[in-house]
């Protein structure tokens, strides 16, 4: 009996969304990378998932790290972390010269792609997205 129940739960969770099937997404998929340099993931891009049921837990998180440049007086982008942790947006001064900025997104799957960085040019991001679309086809 338990095996049939478990099988039915997995069928519902992994069911393909089509026009004949009335489903809603129970899972949120996010990118997972511990060192994203603004262009690519240094240690390999992975994915993670979480249940998309509770409003406070359905976000994908991007943590941008900035270091303070003494010569210019500006915080410059260093790297980003992409993950599935519960998110609290905002800025946090980690050390005297390291700042962490956290972005949360809930609009779609894999929405934490590292493009929420203000130091990256929008022209470069559009070019990266076009290359990605061409490679996906």
From Swiss-Prot:
InterPro entries, alphabetized: LY6_UPA_recep-like
One Pfam family named in its UniProt record: UPAR_LY6
Keyword Disulfide bond included in the entry's annotation: yes
Domain UPAR/Ly6: 28-114
Record's signal peptide: 1-20
CDD domains on file: TFP_LU_ECD_PATE2
Keyword Glycoprotein in annotation: yes
Keyword entries, A-Z: Disulfide bond, Glycoprotein, Secreted, Signal
Cysteine-cysteine disulfides: 30-60, 33-41, 48-84, 87-104, 105-111
Tissue localization of expression: Strongly expressed in the epididymis, including the initial segment, caput, corpus and cauda regions. Weakly expressed in prostate.
Localisation per UniProt entry: Secreted
Glycosylation sites: 57
One Gene Ontology CC term in the entry: extracellular region
Superkingdom of origin organism: Eukaryota
Family: Belongs to the PATE family.
Entry protein name: Prostate and testis expressed protein 13
Organism of origin: Mus musculus (Mouse)
């Amino acid at each position: 009996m338990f095996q049939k129940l478990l099988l039915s739960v997995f069928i519902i969770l992994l069911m393909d969304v089509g026009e004949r099937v009335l489903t809603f997404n129970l899972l949120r998929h996010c990118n997972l990378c511990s060192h994203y340099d603004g262009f690519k993931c240094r240690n390999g891009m992975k994915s993670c998932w979480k249940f998309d049921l509770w409003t406070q837990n359905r976000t994908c998180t991007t943590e941008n790290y900035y270091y303070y440049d003494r010569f210019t007086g500006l915080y410059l982008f260093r790297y980003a972390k992409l993950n599935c942790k519960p998110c609290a947006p905002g800025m946090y001064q980690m050390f005297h010269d390291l700042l962490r900025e956290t972005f949360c997104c809930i609009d779609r799957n894999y929405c934490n792609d590292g493009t929420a960085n203000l130091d990256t040019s929008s022209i470069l991001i559009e070019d990266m997205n076009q290359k990605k679309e061409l490679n996906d086809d």
